[in-house]
Amino acid sequence: MTKKEERDAKLPPKSNFSEWYHELLRSAEIVDVRYPVKGMSVWYPFGFALRSHVYQIIKELLDVDHYETQFPLLIPETEFMKEAEHIKGFEDEVYWVTHGGRDPLDIKLALRPTSETAIYPMLKLWIRSHADLPLRIYQIVNTFRYETKHTRPLIRLREITSFKEAHTAHATWEEAAMQVEIAIQRYIEFYRRLAIPCLVSKRPSWDKFPGADYSIALDVIMPDGRTLQVGTAHLLGTNFAKTYEITYEDEHGEQRYVNQTCYGISERCIAALIAVHGDDKGLVLPWRVAPVQVVIVPIIFGEREPIIEVCRSIASTLAGRNIRVRLDDGDERPGAKFYKWEMRGVPVRIEIGPRDIKNGVVTIVRRDGVRKTLPMDERLVDAILIEAEELQTVLYNRAKEFMDSKIKLVSSLDEARSQVQSGVARVPWCGSVECGHALEDQIGANLLGEPRGDELPPMRCLVCGRESTGSTYMARQY
């Protein structure tokens, strides 16, 4: 962004969420939406650095027992069309390659909307016996979906640039079901490290992943009360194994179908990070993922060079402890620098002026507004790391308090209709498909599914009146 663009950038208040979000993506240089294909954005270098630090967390969590791999982007139509239920869920969203140069292709090639139909023909070749199981792999790739709805950067795209999809194969259905639980727990931990609490629910049968036995999803409540699905895990059972003939020889020499799972996260996790923690000044980033963790701003009064030398020394010390630090020694006024780095969400700002040097201290300002004086000696780095941990705790607690404030157990359809205008309604539900569809129609919101592990005392389904301990989250969704 040019200096003129920076001066002209005026961030709307976060209460005007849609405008705030789109302007912040530009002003903080996360993604540029001006690419000349609708629904496809370009990562700015700063935004891509943020993305890299975020995805490093999920890689660390998966690398414990998964192997990273990469499969081709193009999927032959003959493989893609094999799984009828799966294809029914994606057929209107597929981009097709029909020509190579000027020559029509004998077999059309799909740009992957997701990779089951690319990966599973290979698993048939890789898996031979029970000794090959469990198999756990993942890839981080781009996927393409012809979205006809209103596109939103990082939220609803035609090119998903950062799709992390894991695929596993197991000997039994029970082992696959356990893998789904492990996946959900790792996703919860992933978002905890981003200081983001999530709703976890089992999706209704009509909203499960095409071809799955069942689906579990994570949702984040956005500032306007809508929910954003930010992760899913699916138990596929033997459905795809039967289609692609993925079998193994068991201990008794018998051929059996594998049981499979798949689970994924996209750059929606970046959208959630921005939306949940950001404020009227811009991004607010947790320490772990901030491209710049500490910015040092010299406060120049009198002679410049002695102050700059002290700042350089502190920057060198911080960098020596693997802290991502930036010394902003440009000609702008301190206030302009504060504005710029607050917009980019830097967790800790250090201010150093002549008085600080004289007193042997530095002034630090955390991105949540906490201001402290710390000693300018060997204790400084550890003191800053403590502040980083405190900021993480503050961000999570603040986000959890907001999420809890947006969820309400309702006892009537009118109350539910009112609640979903600005939050999530927890609605008594008997669990039937008929009543589920009726709830969606009468409340005017999406049925997210049954909350995990939190039964209600007996209440009556708001549609049929039958007594039930079941319930569902309902919300307007992105």
UniProtKB/Swiss-Prot annotation:
Keywords: Aminoacyl-tRNA synthetase, ATP-binding, Cytoplasm, Ligase, Nucleotide-binding, Protein biosynthesis
GO molecular function (one): proline-tRNA ligase activity
GO cellular component, one term: cytoplasm
Principal place of residence: cytoplasm
Record localization: Cytoplasm
Entry EC no(s): 6.1.1.15
Superkingdom classification of source: Archaea
GO BP terms: prolyl-tRNA aminoacylation
Annotated catalysed reactions: tRNA(Pro) + L-proline + ATP = L-prolyl-tRNA(Pro) + AMP + diphosphate
Family: Belongs to the class-II aminoacyl-tRNA synthetase family. ProS type 3 subfamily.
Free-text comment on this protein's domains from its UniProt entry: Consists of three domains: the N-terminal catalytic domain, the anticodon-binding domain and the C-terminal extension.
Subunit details: Homodimer.
Role of this protein: Catalyzes the attachment of proline to tRNA(Pro) in a two-step reaction: proline is first activated by ATP to form Pro-AMP and then transferred to the acceptor end of tRNA(Pro).
The protein's name: Proline--tRNA ligase
Organism, as annotated: Methanothrix thermoacetophila (strain DSM 6194 / JCM 14653 / NBRC 101360 / PT)
Gene, per the UniProt record: proS
